[in-house]
Amino acid sequence: DTVNDATAFLETFFKLYPTATEKELAYYVSGNVLEPIGRDYLYSELINPIFTKDGENVKVKVAVKFLDNQTKATQVSQYELVLHKDSNWKIIG
């Protein structure tokens, strides 16, 4: 189902996102919607994702918990994203 699919996509994406290059991000993100983080963060979990169907797209509000490998501190970042699925999911906004 859409929510499970989108959740799995986001988990995969946020595992890669902290260390991804712009070229790698291009597979998951349309244009420059998200800038590379370029930090040694380790994905921990999605916190309370809220999905809203918006025509062909799915909007998601989510907090993402990362572990900073340098400081061992927990970092929580808020995201509001628009997802679209053709053959694969992509973050378009």
Where would I find each of the regions flagged by the language model?
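Surface-exposed, charged secondary-structure patches
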Residues: 42-80, 84-85
